[in-house]
């Protein structure tokens, strides 16, 4: 009975370690993708790609002012 309990605890700890390392590797991969991705290497203006026919030029200018320091 002791060996089964020990084995169960070992498996639980092992599975926790695997899931944590997978999360860390995923976060590192996502960070590298964001740093070295195609879009991040270019200087892109996000407001340039905003398209909504209901927005006027004054609305876009106001949005740009609001998003300057964001």
Curated annotation (Swiss-Prot):
The family this protein is said to belong to: Belongs to the non-disulfide-bridged peptide (NDBP) superfamily. Short antimicrobial peptide (group 4) family.
Lineage: Eukaryota, Metazoa, Ecdysozoa, Arthropoda, Chelicerata
Source organism: Mesobuthus eupeus
Name recorded for this polypeptide: Venom antimicrobial peptide-6
Signal peptide span: 1-23
One MF annotation (Gene Ontology) recorded for this entry: toxin activity
Expression across tissues: Expressed by the venom gland.
Function noted in UniProt: Amphipathic peptide that exhibits extensive cytolytic activities against both prokaryotic and eukaryotic cells. Is more potent against Gram-positive bacteria (lethal concentration (LC)=0.25-2.9 uM) than against Gram-negative bacteria (LC=6.2->50 uM), and fungi ((LC)=14.1->50 uM). Shows hemolytic activity against rabbit erythrocytes (37.7% of inhibition at 6.25 uM) and cytolysis against rat dorsal root ganglions. In vivo, intravenous injection into mice tail provokes uncomfortable symptoms with a death rate of 12.5%.
Keywords tagged on the record: Amidation, Antibiotic, Antimicrobial, Cleavage on pair of basic residues, Cytolysis, Fungicide, Hemolysis, Membrane, Secreted, Signal, Target cell membrane, Target membrane, Toxin, Transmembrane
Domain of life: Eukaryota
Phenylalanine amide PTM positions: 36
GO biological process, one term: defense response to fungus
Subcellular location: Secreted; Target cell membrane
Cellular component aspect of the GO annotation: extracellular region; membrane; other organism cell membrane
């Amino acid at each position: 009975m002791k060996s089964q309990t020990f084995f169960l605890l070992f498996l639980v700890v092992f599975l926790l370690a695997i899931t944590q390392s997978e999360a860390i590797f995923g976060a590192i991969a996502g960070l590298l993708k964001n740093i070295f991705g195609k879009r991040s290497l270019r200087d892109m203006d996000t407001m340039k790609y905003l398209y909504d026919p209901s927005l006027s030029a004054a609305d876009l200018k106001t949005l740009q002012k609001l998003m300057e320091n964001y």
